[in-house]
Regions:
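Conserved beta-alpha-beta core of the PfkB/ribokinase-like small-molecule kinase fold
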Residues: 1-55, 62-63, 73
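Conserved phosphate-binding/catalytic region of the ribokinase-like
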Residues: 45-153
Length: 153
């Protein structure tokens, strides 16, 4: 299984066209894509998440896509299914660094445990809720990657 998270940081690129080209290559190689709402807009010009993801799936033939939308939650697209999960909004958020990476780690944990082909809507909803909760928890403390926590947390 090849996963890809574009993790677009415009300030790190001399030319955004080059970023788009490199991200497109990553998408063309992956089985699992974790992508944020702003990255969907960057790559497709679409502000509608569903339409943007459908464009990416059609163009790159990606079997499993998870879109993160900040306080709007997340969505998974697989086969002909779309599953949504609400965000966990934390009153004591102090640093969002690592939230996307934490979400992606939880996503991959579920896929490795249950397989990419054997996903059903309920399991995917559970996966999104788990990933959203973990991503929310990571924002409540200033921490390093080594302090990310465990499945139990």
């Amino acid at each position: 299984i090849i996963s890809f998270d574009p993790n677009l940081r415009p300030a790190l690129w001399n030319h955004l066209d080059e970023a788009k080209e490199k991200i497109a290559f990553g998408m063309s190689q992956c089985d699992v894509l974790k992508i944020s709402d702003n990255e969907i807009t960057f790559m497709t010009g679409e502000t509608d998440i569903d339409r943007g993801v459908q464009k990416l799936i059609e163009k790159y033939q990606i079997p499993f896509v998870c879109a993160t939308m900040g306080n709007q939650g997340s969505k998974a697209f697989f086969g002909s299914e779309i599953v949504e999960a609400e965000a966990f909004l934390m009153e004591d958020t102090i640093d969002t660094t690592g939230a996307g990476d934490t979400f992606c780690a939880c996503l991959l944990d579920y896929i490795l445990r249950y397989g990419i082909q054997k996903q059903d809507k309920e399991r995917v909803r559970e996966m999104l809720q788990f990933a959203n909760a973990a991503a929310a928890l990571i924002t409540t403390k200033k921490r390093s990657a080594s302090d990310a926590g465990t499945r139990r947390n």
